[in-house]
Structures are given as C-alpha cells and as structure tokens.
Amino acid sequence: IFGQIFRNARAIMYNSFEEQILINAVSDNAHVPSVIVGVGSKVPHHTAPERFRRKFKIDHPFIIYVGRVDANKGCKQLFEYFIRYVTNVSGKLSLVLIGNSVLPIPAHERIHHLGFTSDKDKFDGMAAAELLVIPSQYESLSMATLEAWGLGRPVLANGHCDVLKGQCLRSNAGLYYDNYEEFAEALHALETSSPLRKGLGHNGRRFFS
C-alpha cells in the first residue's frame, strides 16, 4: 500500500538523505521528484548551565539523553553500556536523563532521571553536558541531535541508525558506535579530550546554522 502511495506522489519532501534512500529502495520511486528539507529547529541564544547544575544538584561531569526513556529508543542498552563503562573504564561521568520513562531505570548513583522538564531546563542541561548520547537505532530525524549541535555540543550516536550515522559523517560533529567496545572507546575519547569536544561542537554549530 505505502509503496504505491510513494510511487504515485507528485513530489516528496524527505527529512534526510538516508530517509530518501530507504523509501527509494523499498518503494522503487526514484522517479518521483523530491527534495531534502529537514525540519526547523530553534535553540536559545543564552543558556545557564550552572543554574541547571545547582537546581538538580549535579556536581559531576555528565552526558545527557533527551527523549522518551524506552527500550525501543535504545535506553536499555544504554544503561548496560554506561554502567559497564563507569565500572570498568572511568567512574567520573554521570548520565542524566530528561524525558518520561516507560522503562525501569537502574538504581545507580551515576544515573539521574529528571523526568519531563521545561524547555529552559532541557536546553540548560544540554549546555551543561559534555555531550548528548543518542542510543536509538530507529530515527528518521533526531531533533535532540540538532538542538545539541545548535548549542555547540558533540553527539555520541548509535551507528546502527543510518540517519544518525549519516548526520555525524556529514557534520563532522559526532562519533558513533556499533558495539560496547566502540561505545567505550568513543566515550572515553570525548570525556578526556576537551579539544575534541570543542572541535566537534564547533562543527555542530556550523552544521545547525
């Protein structure tokens, strides 16, 4: 049914190159006129990262996840990877989660679930974080990724998601992983290298704009 719809459309607007490639492959509709339009996104000109730290009593450097806390979003694997990382590689980082949860969250001193927050808290949290982590395999376009780049923060993404991987490669503003070993190596590189974080973050701002 959907294949016929995509083949008979007069024109199609796609959110990303990877989305276009997928639809072309499954629908055989490369003949249909199309354009990559992305989606509009705004971030504040000024943020208050220290206000966020004081409000939520977070003293350690942290990485942040923004979105529904759900196994389908890769959060169960993220918990496993992160706990393994802070146990065996580096115990300095915390993981901050912003968003409603439909998944049990491990009771761990370095995992902080803030629930649903205001946009101000969300953006201040992103600005305070070392990086944004996106563990989902299934994204057609990640708004949180674009927002993080708009704020000059690098991204660590699930490399099994073609869209996220493609965005990281085109922007040169993020790293990606396919397994725990790559997750740990990429996270350790980002955690320990301020020049790397700043360089990727700078590229992210440029890509966002």
Residue locations for each model-derived region?
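Helix-loop-beta element that forms the nucleotide-linked donor phosphate-binding surface
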Residues: 7-8, 20-41
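Nucleotide-activated donor-binding/catalytic signature segment of Leloir-type glycosyltransferases, i.e.
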Residues: 99-123
